[in-house]
Amino acid sequence: MRFRSQRAVCRSRNYSMYCCSRVFVRNPRLDRRYPQVKILAKLHFFFHFFFSFLLHLISPAVTGGITRAPFLCLGPRVPLFRLERPLHAARTSRRCAGAASVSVDGATVEAPPLWTASCRTTPQVRARA
């Protein structure tokens, strides 16, 4: 029986990288043959979790929050993080219609996209002296 590579097995099972790495780490024979898999899986998981969580903290209006626990590995092609809505799709409703401009020292300025996307009340921005 020919020994198949890690990539071939991943492709045939349609696993994501993290799930596939976990499958390989469980098998001692494959762990000896591919010692880098364990390290890569940990690094990939850490950076994926860290940066996605950081992005979630910085701008929850854009990311829509984390919708799946990052440590779950539920089967083939399960995304660890999923956007609830497209990045640039502003939630335009009737109550958001007036939120496109901001008053800055008496002058009307166009609001940044995030203010209109998150449907907050039009903020009053005052320049500090």
Swiss-Prot record:
TM region(s), chain numbering: 46-66
This protein's UniProt keywords: Membrane, Transmembrane, Transmembrane helix
Membrane topology: Single-pass membrane protein
A GO cellular component annotation in the UniProt record: membrane
Localization in the cell: Membrane
UniProt keyword annotation of Transmembrane helix present: yes
Primary localization class, coarse: membrane
Misc. remarks from the entry: Partially overlaps YLR280C and YLR281C.
Protein name: Putative uncharacterized protein YLR279W
Organism per entry: Saccharomyces cerevisiae (strain ATCC 204508 / S288c) (Baker's yeast)
